[in-house]
Amino acid sequence: MAQPKLVPRMQAVPQPGQQVSFQRDGIEIARYHFGNESGRPFVFPLIGPSGRSVTRIGHPNDPQSHSHHYSVWVAHRDVNGVNFWEERGKNVGRIVHQSIEPFFDSADAAAVQTVNAWLDHTGKPLLTERRRITAQWLPNREWLLIVDLQFSATSEPVTLGKTPFGVMAVRMAKTIGVHDGGGTIRNSEGAANDKEIFWKPAKWVDYSGPITAAATEGATLFDHPANPNHPAVFHVRDDGWMGASLTFDGSRVIAPGKPLQLRYGVYVHADQPAREQLQERWEEFSRTPPFEFKPRGK
């Protein structure tokens, strides 16, 4: 009798409404949303070891003007002068899902691969983006979200303008924020909170704080050494958000036929790990190569 195939413990499971549920033994730890009503794909929730999400949608005290804060998302404020960061305005673009490429399930990781079009306000495509979202299981119910990105200019050179806004951002749960929950921001350079970390380069930035009355959890945003501006300048705020800036120091041009590839990680963890532990996790991540996107249609 043939041996039954093993059921992967980590699975990326398609859901109604253009969503993918990342599950460990059938229990969701994250969900990728790629419907076009939001103007950009995003990941929400990111479930920590306690069973609660360490991220949220929107600013807890200013939800109207920060409605574009979608938990974990990819965006940029200046793409050939078009604003892909905010949702409202005269020159606002949209990141529109085009297609899904293969799913991947295994014992300790699951992934989904998609194609997005970055369209200006007239619908003109500026960039084609290929994205791979991976959830990698770690000991003690912790896990790592890996975001691989490949940007290609569609027909003419595209300039990502100088700005601290973009491309990788995380909005933390209200109780984890420094202002609202008494949380703490730390970086790889030994600095703490907005005053010391804001607009400073680092390998990683961690945001930890209360998630229940008895538990502390958080997330660490990793910049990969293969990224062209590593170590990235981080834009952080005590109100609960952190982002890795790609073009803080100057613009970057993507020429046709010469795609830009990026890799980031978000480590979802229990407690407030020591800096040495976070550095060890970052070093493990730094040794992993960026995902190799195969030519489309092959």
Spans of features found by a protein language model:
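Active-site/ligand-binding surface loops and adjacent short beta/alpha elements
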Residues: 157-228
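Beta-strand-rich recognition/accessory modules
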Residues: 219-298
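Extended, loop-rich substrate-binding clefts of extracytoplasmic carbohydrate-active enzymes
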Residues: 66-141
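Extracellular/lumen-exposed scaffold segments
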Residues: 37-87, 182-204
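Residue-level recognition of well-ordered beta-strand positions that form the cores
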Residues: 27, 115-117, 130-132, 148-152, ...
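Acidic (Asp/Glu-rich), glycine- and aromatic
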Residues: 35-38, 42-45, 138-184, 277
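Beta-strand-rich interaction surfaces with strong enrichment in secreted/lumenal proteins
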Residues: 44, 133-136, 249-252
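Beta-strand-rich N-terminal accessory domains
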Residues: 3-67, 279
